[in-house]
Amino acid sequence: GSSSWRRSFEPPPRVARGSIDWDSLKPALGDAQPFAFSDRSPEALPARRFPHLAQTDCRETATTPEIHALIRDNLGRAPMYSGQIDAECGPRYCPSIEDKIVRFADRDAHHVFLEPESLFTDEIYLNGVSTSLPADVQLPLVRGLRGLEHAVIQKFGYAVEYDMVWPHQIDATAETKRVPRLFLAGQINGTSGYEE
């Protein structure tokens, strides 16, 4: 067997686009020209290799000191802070809003990016507000954001706890070193699944 490590993941709430004052928010534009992942690609290649697609309309807002106070007052109700979830850590680059308020207590605001969940739904992903706080805290948290004063939450944030196999037990092909022909991908590798 492999030794594992407990991790957690807390996706943010999803909000109905029609309930957002979209025009009051700052546009958050993507890159006009896509870039290749490899630094070996000549600059002319990306334009030929990647199709030019219409930009998805995203927006930006920010948390406020009032939202931070609401979160601090309810930290004990968040599973990661109450001890209900005992994962050793959450995602390194996408900390929960609770973690941001605790770790960066000197900041008055944190960016929140409003991103369409897909081209075929009106669900908006609130990137930057990952949380597992109860619904009765999430609603005023979300409605405290500028432009979301009348937001309708379609899916509340929540917490997931899972096992992760230590990276030194997996080789570069994603095959486990202890069990031949067993390949792992996704959260069990401690990633979000981008290696597939």
State what each model feature region is.
Residues F113, Y125-N189:
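A glycine-rich dinucleotide-binding beta-alpha-beta segment and adjacent secondary-structure elements
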Residues G1, G76, R146-E149, G193:
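Hydrophobic/aromatic-lined pockets within catalytic cores
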Residues G1-L139:
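An anion/pyrophosphate-binding glycine-rich loop and adjacent beta-alpha core
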Residues N189-E196:
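A conserved FAD-binding loop/helix module that cradles the flavin
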